[in-house]
C-alpha cells in the first residue's frame, strides 16, 4: 500500500468520527430543548422556572439552601448548640419554680401593651364601619354620581334618564357608559375602593386592609398584625411579638425574652440574663455579672469587680482598686498602698511627701512626688526629714528661686575673680 492509500484511510476514519460527534451533539440539543419545552408548558411557565430543578435559567435558587456548609454549621453538630439544653441542670433551673420565669409574662404591662387597647390592634379586624361612614372616599360614587359641571337641579341632568323613548330613537353610546357596569366604581376591576383585584380596602388579592394575600392588617401571607408568614404581632415566621423564627418576645431563634439562640433574657447563645455564651447575668463567656470571660462583676477576663484580667475592683491587669498593673489605689505600675494622694508615675510604698525631686528614692515624701520616685527604704533604716510648710515659709524653695540664687552667686564669684585678676596685674606692672 502506498502512502496515498494510508492517508485516504485516515481521512475517511476522521470524517466518520466527526460526523458521529456532530450527530450526538444534535441529539443532546434536541433532547434538552424538548425537556425545556415540556417543563415550560404549564399555564404559568414562569412559576416553575428554576424552582425545583437547577437549570441554566436560575442556578441561584438552590444555591446554599441545603448543600452549603454554612446552612447547617452549628445547628446540630456544634457542641455549643446542645450545650446545657437538656442534660445541664442549669437548663431547668428557674424555669417553673423561679419567680423570674413568670415575671412579666401576664402581669407586666409591657406584655399586654397595645394588644387590646391599641387602636391599631382592632383596626380592620371585625368591621371598618366607622371609617367607611366618616371617610368621604367610601361613599364616593356608590349611590349617586355627582357632576361638578351638571348639578342635580339642572334640567340637563335628568334629561332622558327615565323617560320612555320612541321606538326608532337610539341612545348615545356615551349615555350608558359606566352607569350600571363595574366601571362606575373605583379600583381597576372590582368594587368599593379596592386594590387590584379584591374588595373593600384591600391589598392586592385580599380583603379589609390586608397585605398581599392575607386578611386584616397582615403581612405578606399571614393574618392579624403578622410578619412575613406568621400571625398576631409576629416576626418573620413566628407568633406573638417574636424575633425572626421564635415566639413570645424572642430573639432570632429562641423563646421568651431570649437572645439570639437562648432563652429567658439571654445573650447570644446563653440563658437567663447572660452574656454572649454564658448564664445568669454574665459577660461574654462567663457567669453571674461577669466581664468578657470571668464571673461576678468582672472586667474583661477576670472575676469579682475586676479590671481587664484581674479580680475585685482591679485596674487593667491587677486586683482590688488597682491602677493599670498594681493593687489598691495605685499609680500606673505600683502596688499595695502606693503613693495614694498625688504620687508620681512609678512611685512605690511610703514615698516621701511634699516636693520630692524627679528621680529621688528612699526618704522621698509621699505627697507631690516627682515623676519616677521609687520605694522608700525600710522604716528602721530610713531617715526623717523636716517637712517645710510652704505656706508658712516666707521664702519657699522652688526650682525657679533656686536658679536665680545660683545665678546671683555665680555673678558674685565671677566679679571676685575679675577683681583678683586686676589686683594681680596691677602688682606685676
UniProtKB/Swiss-Prot annotation:
Q: Which domain of life is it from?
A: Eukaryota
Annotated Gene Ontology cellular components are: extracellular region
Its name, as the record gives it, is Antho-RFamide neuropeptides type 2
Q: Where is this region: Disordered?
A: 230-429
User: What are the residue ranges of the propeptide?
Assistant: 23-233, 239-241, 247-249, 255-257, 263-265, 271-273, 279-289, 295-297, 303-305, 311-321, 327-329, 335-342, 348-355, 361-368, 374-429
Which BP terms in the Gene Ontology apply to this protein? neuropeptide signaling pathway
Function, as annotated, reads: Not known but it could act as a transmitter at neuromuscular synapses.
Compositional bias (Basic and acidic residues) spans?
Answer: 230-371, 392-429
Xref: InterPro entries: Antho-RFamide, FMRFamid-related_peptide-like
The signal peptide here is 1-22
Keyword check for Transferase, yes or no: no
Q: Per the database entry, which stretches of residues form a coiled coil?
A: none
